[in-house]
Structures are given as structure tokens and as C-alpha cells.
Curated annotation (Swiss-Prot):
The active site is at residue 78. The modification N6-(pyridoxal phosphate)lysine is found at residue 51. Its EC number is 3.5.99.7. This is 1-aminocyclopropane-1-carboxylate deaminase. GO terms for molecular function: 1-aminocyclopropane-1-carboxylate deaminase activity; D-cysteine desulfhydrase activity; pyridoxal phosphate binding. It catalyses: 1-aminocyclopropane-1-carboxylate + H2O = 2-oxobutanoate + NH4(+). It is an enzyme of class 3 (hydrolase). It comes from Paraburkholderia xenovorans (strain LB400).
Length: 338
């Protein structure tokens, strides 16, 4: 497997830290040892996050093609679009963001705070569109690309989550390689990796990266899309494409893709009671914040798996914290009392 042959434009600080979640582990019985890899602390560009790691492999193509405008899409509180806006500002490029109404939730300030507020401050052309949630290609995004061309610009198309893109899985192949280096320093290997999944390329990259040492099925995706069949198909397809691209040397099978569907409800972007309990518990045990859309759901999943005895005693579990905390501001009413 060879990731080095792909050009990478550095947007992150370097390897992200691995932090023991000692108090949370003890609170949950002390039989499973929890750690977090802090992708939420990976960059100085508008709080960074998992999409910033992915964008490192897209930006060389942007520059090689002479593009002047990054065009991306997400929900109103999209972390993806905030990270694309930050990278565009960093590179001196224009940015057009399509922000669709993906979440069936209303808050007095939902479209004026958090991620979308930061994108506006970063100078992006933010376009609100009423269309609902989907993880496929969108007409509104195609129209935004065409509008840039019509104005004489040269757009570069970045799909939701950087996912359905030929290079979208590479960043998290690199994540797995980085974990292996850190495991050598720590003197032990992680038995499981827990990660949130929606558009698919984060888990897909991990599956490929950890397949290199036989741990593909130890990557446990926690679905937050509430459309698990679509998410599972996308993870599998992107993983297969990425495996071929990096020369993994074997096919990715359905058995390699583990996606837990229990924690996504009631629907995308809406937290359930377990999500909210997990957000508060992690915050109060570790001082680590998670969000109601993504990381709160994957944290809920990991906590419940520990409580249910689904990890063997003595297991070391690595929680991939992908970022997303700015979205908390969009849910101010839910958290009005903390």
C-alpha cells in the first residue's frame, strides 16, 4: 500500500494527539480502556476537523487545475462547508457554499450561529436552499458550479463530506498509518476504533488503512444518517475505490464494513436522549465537547457498547473525535440549561 505517491498539501498541524479518557473509562466500570484521537484539534484553520485532513489530498489537484473557487455543499450547520471556507480563505480563493435544509429542527438562531456564521466571516458566498437531507449529488450544487462558470470563474467541486470524490478516502488511510506509528510509541495496539459515519469516506479510508494489518472489521462505524443502507453502500464503494487506488492488494468485502445502526435516531441532525446524555457525560467527565449531529451519536454508541459489555474486558478502544463542536451553538434551546 502506497500513500506517499499522492501529493498532499499540508493544512493540519501534524499527527493528532491520542488522549486517554481515564475518568470516562472509570465511570463506565473500568473494564474497557477508552482513548480519543483528537481530529477536532488537527488544524488552526477555523477549528479544523476530519474534512481538513481529507482536503489535504484534494488541494494539490485544485492548484494543478488552476481553479479559483471552491464549491461545496452541506446542511445549514455543516462542518464540511466551514472547513472548505477556511481552506479557501487560507489559499486566497473564492468559496461558494450551498447550505441545504438537511435537519428537521428549528432554533431562533440556527442559521446565524456556529458553522454557518464562521463560513460567512471567512468570506464565503453562502447560499441557503430549502432542499432536504440526502448524501448523493445535488441539483443545487450543480447549479452553484454552473453559476461560477457563467461568471467566468473556474470552480472545483467538493462533494458533501469530501466523500464521493476519487481522492476523498485518502486522508483517513493516512489516519490509520498515523495510528500505527503512535501505537508503536505507546507500546500497544488498539482493539477497536469507533467513528461516526454519514457520507462515508472517513470510515472508508479507515477500513482500507486498517485492512493493511488485518483490522478492517475492528473499525466500528456509528451511523448518524438514519439512512444506513445508503451510508453502508457509500462506505463500501468508496473503500473499494480507495483500496484499488492505494494498492492495498486485496478486495474490500461487505464483512470489512461494520456499521451500527442503533444510535442515529430519530433522524439525521436530531439528537435523542442517549445523544444528549453522552454529550453531557463526556463533557463533565473529560472536558471534551461533542455535537448533537455526529460526535454525540458516536459517543453515545461507544458508551452503550461499553455498558452492554460488547467490548471484551481489557479492550483498548480508540474514539475518533472528528470535530463538529461549532454546531452546538445551533442547538441553543436544547442546551439552554446545560
Amino acid at each position: 500500500m502506497n500513500l506517499q505517491r499522492f501529493p498532499r498539501y499540508p493544512l493540519t498541524f501534524g499527527p493528532t494527539p491520542i488522549q486517554p479518557l481515564a475518568r470516562l473509562s472509570k465511570h463506565l466500570g473500568g473494564k474497557v480502556h477508552l482513548y480519543a484521537k483528537r481530529e477536532d484539534c488537527n488544524s488552526g484553520l477555523a477549528f479544523g476537523g476530519n474534512k481538513t485532513r481529507k482536503l489535504e489530498y484534494l488541494i494539490p489537484e485544485v492548484l494543478a487545475q488552476g481553479c479559483d473557487t471552491l464549491v461545496s455543499i452541506g446542511g445549514i450547520q455543516s462542518n464540511q462547508t466551514r472547513q472548505v471556507a477556511a481552506v479557501a480563505a487560507h489559499l486566497g480563493m473564492k468559496c461558494v457554499l450551498v447550505q441545504e435544509n438537511w435537519v428537521n429542527y428549528s432554533d431562533a438562531v440556527y442559521d446565524r450561529v456556529g458553522n454557518i456564521q464562521m463560513s460567512r466571516i471567512l468570506g464565503a458566498d453562502v447560499r441557503l436552499v430549502p432542499d432536504g437531507f440526502d448524501i448523493g449529488f445535488r441539483k443545487s450544487w450543480e447549479e452553484a458550479l454552473e453559476s461560477v462558470r457563467a461568471a467566468g470563474g473556474k470552480p472545483y467541486a467538493i462533494p458533501a463530506g469530501c466523500s464521493d470524490h476519487p481522492l476523498g478516502g485518502l486522508g483517513f488511510v493516512g489516519f490509520a498509518e498515523e495510528v500505527r506509528q503512535q501505537e508503536a510509541e505507546l507500546g500497544f495496539k488498539f482493539d477497536y476504533v469507533v467513528v461516526c459515519s454519514v457520507t462515508g469516506s472517513t470510515q472508508a479510508g479507515m477500513v482500507v488503512g486498517f485492512a493493511a494489518d488485518g483490522r478492517a472489521d475492528r473499525v466500528i462505524g456509528i451511523d448518524a444518517s438514519a439512512k444506513p443502507a445508503q451510508t453502508r453502500e457509500q462506505i463500501t464503494r468508496i473503500a473499494r475505490q480507495t483500496a484499488e487506488k492505494v494498492g492495498l492488494g486485496r478486495d474490500i468485502t461487505s464483512e470489512d464494513v461494520v456499521l451500527d445502526e442503533r444510535f442515529a435516531g430519530p433522524e439525521y441532525g436530531l439528537p435523542n436522549d442517549g445523544t444528549l446524555e453522552a454529550i453531557r457525560l463526556c463533557a463533565r467527565m473529560e472536558g471534551v465537547l461533542t455535537d448533537p449531529v455526529y460526535e454525540g451519536k458516536s459517543m453515545h454508541g461507544m458508551i452503550e457498547m461499553v455498558r452492554n459489555g460488547e467490548f471484551p474486558e481489557g479492550s483498548r478502544v480508540l474514539y475518533a473525535h472528528l470535530g463538529g463542536v461549532p454546531a452546538l451553538n445551533g442547538y441553543s434551546f436544547i442546551f439552554r440549561n446545560g
